[in-house]
From Swiss-Prot:
It is a single-pass membrane protein. Residues 547-554 are lumenal. The keyword Chaperone does not apply. Pfam families: TPR_1 (PF00515). GO terms for cellular component: chloroplast outer membrane; endoplasmic reticulum membrane; plastid. Its main location: endoplasmic reticulum. Interacts (via TPR region) with HSP70-1, but not with HSP90-2. Interacts with ERDJ2A and ERDJ2B. In the ER membrane, associates with ERDJ2 in membrane complexes of 140 and 200 kDa and specifically interacts with the HSP70 and HSP90 chaperones via its TPR domain. This is Outer envelope protein 61. The chain crosses the membrane at residues 526-546. Disulfide bonds: none annotated. It comes from the Eukaryota.
Length: 554
């Protein structure tokens, strides 16, 4: 799948569209998107083997589509059955096939004209073929488009339209930077314009890609000789000719980058708040959100995050979506209400401020997290433990990363609370502090590091085996989990029956489990903390589906 889905420019285009919508339209579309996972699956398939140009094209079409039209179309799509979607898709594929066949016919006619030396008429055929492929995804029409562009460059060279040849070559090299024919023919155009330095640059690259081609080597040698004898000749215009519009856009974009980023940042925060507010105030939207998360393939959720999800794997998304799927509507609503009350940015976002000034979890938040973890089945916990065992728990961290990790347990909405079914593991499983006397995060980290020492673990296991229930309850309280005397007695009895090796092994697993809990919390927080971003991505996905089915752009 094309990872550019999370590209900042793509997100900006989606958020621009969202900014044009009323809150009612936005809530309506997000609910419709979440109510039909088949649309997501179709979009995922549509985006395979895509180039950035394809997604940008869909985003541009989205920009020119009125929000009210988008809402009406998405409503029809949400109500469509899988059979209806398949029929629409078949119709769109048939249209694509028709356009591709027409382009192939035009290309063949152009080739015949080119072979007879009628280069002007051949160029016209190639241009018409390219125009037919304008709305076709590159995975289907990319090969024909490339052939037409390269043949068009040949026609331009033969008719001395060197400027047009350079522009066409620059277009090809924009998505295929090592295309030998494009480099060679653009180099020839530079040479004929007297731009010898630019010609040498392109021809040298072509020679690097295809060193055995004697024709390229001969032309390169000739241009180098002319450069040595005649000098650079005209002032090099290679960059200006090649990317005149693009370079101007880049320059303008660089000058405006800070203000754009600031505006986008503010819009992103507002979008998150608006999205969560709409979700919080709409029980039906909460239900469809839960259905969407629980039914959507974890690979799809992971793919939507692109490279911005850090080290969260599909397994982490699977764990989070499983937990969300088993929550009651009331719990989902409480979760959203809690998330919508957060101030500031998502602390996991790349531009997030320091977490030192973050919020302090309230008792309600901790109770909510506790209830969630208490309802996890043993199989889910085991899966979380297995997932944690593969993480780099012992990797060294920088100071800033350490600070973020230290503050994360106070900010996370995740695994906190108790469950009598696993009470003897709970004190080491990363539960959140629920009383003021809990040790700070840096002290907990220091204790975990000390427990990596085998001698320290042996001493600690011996101490635990001989600990009475009162001491067990007191120690669990220090770890943020208050056990009753009965639970403490059960935990002490269970530990006393373990062999030293088994107890030490259990402690190692508990340490890994703590890391697993934190990763799972991070995945879950990502799902809820980036609500506006997710819906922005969904807007792009919807645009891709509608573009594929011919609703927009055709």
């Amino acid at each position: 799948m094309f990872n550019g889905l999370m590209d900042p420019e793509m997100i900006r285009l989606a958020q621009d569209q969202m900014s044009r919508m009323t809150p009612a339209d936005f809530a309506r579309i997000q609910q419709q998107m979440m109510s039909n996972p088949d649309l997501m699956n179709m979009a995922t398939e549509s985006m395979k083997n895509m180039r950035p140009e394809d997604l940008k094209q869909a985003a541009e079409q989205l920009k020119h589509t009125r929000p009210e039209d988008m809402a009406e179309i998405s409503e029809k799509m949400a109500k469509a059955s899988p059979e209806d979607i398949a029929a629409m898709r078949a119709h769109a594929d048939a249209q694509f096939t028709y356009q591709i066949n027409a382009a192939q016919m035009l290309k063949k006619q152009g080739n015949e004209l080119h072979s007879r030396g009628n280069f002007s008429d051949a160029a016209e055929k190639y241009l018409r073929a390219k125009n037919n492929l304008k709305e076709i995804p590159s995975s289907k029409g990319g090969a024909i488009l490339l052939a037409c562009s390269l043949n068009l460059m040949s026609c331009y060279l033969k008719t001395n339209q060197h400027e047009e040849c350079i522009k066409e070559g620059s277009e090809v090299l924009g998505y295929d930077a090592r295309n030998v024919k494009a480099l060679y023919r653009r180099g020839q155009a530079y040479r004929d314009l007297g731009l010898f330095e630019d010609a040498v640059s392109d021809l040298s690259k072509a020679h690097e890609v295809s060193p055995e081609d004697e024709t390229i080597a001969d032309v390169l040698r000739d241009v180098k000789e002319r450069l040595a004898v005649e000098g650079p000749g005209k002032a090099s215009r290679g960059v200006v000719i090649e990317d005149i519009t693009e370079e101007n856009n880049v320059t303008s974009g660089e000058n405006k980058k800070p203000s754009k980023e600031a505006n986008g940042h503010a819009q992103g925060v507002k979008t998150d708040v608006d999205g969560l507010q709409a979700l919080r105030d709409n029980p039906e939207a909460i239900r469809t959100f839960q259905n969407f998360i629980s039914k959507t393939d974890p690979d799809t959720l992971a793919a939507l995050s692109g490279g911005k999800a850090g080290d969260m794997s599909p397994d982490m998304f699977k764990t989070a979506s499983s937990m969300i799927g088993k929550m009651s509507p009331e719990e989902i609503q409480k979760m959203v209400q809690t998330a919508s009350s957060f101030k500031g940015d998502n602390p996991f976002a790349p531009t997030a401020p320091s977490t030192e000034n973050g919020f302090t979890p309230t008792p309600d938040m901790l109770k909510l997290a506790s209830d969630m973890m208490g309802k996890m089945s043993p199989e889910e916990r085991e899966r979380m433990f297995n997932m944690a065992s593969s993480l780099k728990a012992n990797a060294p961290a920088s100071t800033s990363y350490g600070n973020a990790e230290a503050s994360e347990p106070r900010e996370s909405l995740g695994a906190s609370g108790s469950s009598s079914g696993n009470s003897f593991v709970a004190p080491r499983s990363g539960f959140e502090p629920s009383i003021p006397s809990a040790p700070p995060a840096d002290l907990q980290e220091q204790m975990r590091n000390q427990m990596k020492d085998p001698a320290m673990r042996q001493m600690f296991t011996s101490m635990i085996k001989n600990m009475n229930p009162e001491m067990m309850a007191s120690m669990s309280e220090q770890f943020g989990m208050k056990l009753s005397q009965e639970d403490a007695a059960k935990a002490q009895q269970a530990m006393a029956s373990l062999s030293p090796d088994a107890l030490e092994k259990m402690m190692r697993w508990a340490d890994r489990a703590q890391t697993g809990m934190e990763k799972a919390k991070k995945a879950k927080k990502w799902l809820f903390g980036k609500g506006g971003l997710i819906f922005a991505i969904l807007m792009l996905v919807l645009a891709m589906v509608l573009h594929r089915l011919g609703y927009i752009g055709n």
